[in-house]
Amino acid sequence: MKKLLYVIIAMAAILVSCNDYETYGDKKEKERNAISKFIADSSITVISEDQFNQQGYTTDLTRNEFVKLDKSGVYMQIVRKGCGEGLSDGESTNLVCRFRETDILNDTLQAYNDVSAYAGIPDIMHVSRTGSTYTASFTSGMMYSIYGASVPGGWMVPLTYIKVGRPQSMEEECSKVRLIVPHSQGHSTATSYVKPYYYVITFEREAK
């Protein structure tokens, strides 16, 4: 009788553990729901790539527009196009990046270096362009300290559409974007835990 009871208890424990287990599909669905909720809560207007192209690769800030880029799944808002020039084909350079990172799934501010206390320690990203392909690695900064040298794919998405010059006057400003980055375009933590992240990032060339 006791043996039968032990078997029943063991089977119940297995059933509970199976019910608690999340498949990759479950996690992706949870991610999609979290992104949809974030978009709704933030009153974001999502536009297609076609509309984005027709608008001259701009997003209307008065309507809080984000374009969903089909290839990457990244949602992007261009706050400022920036000054100077974008990266030219065959070019490699260092970009100074200041950012704010939010874990969308848990609605938690994870990391930032966009305040005066961290003004002297931005992230430095070494980036190269070959045709339409960008590759990059962090060489120093907070992202480098937390996640290592690998740059999230989502961070490179805006480089096709912005200028990365360094402001030379009060009238000029560095480029600034807002991104919703799914786990597939995120850093190692995002990929491992199937978590989407929200970023506010500025880019400019490093002073020579």
Predicted regions mapped to residue ranges:
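Cross-family detector of peptidyl-prolyl cis-trans isomerase
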Residues: 18-208
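Sec-dependent bacterial lipoprotein signal peptides
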Residues: 1-18
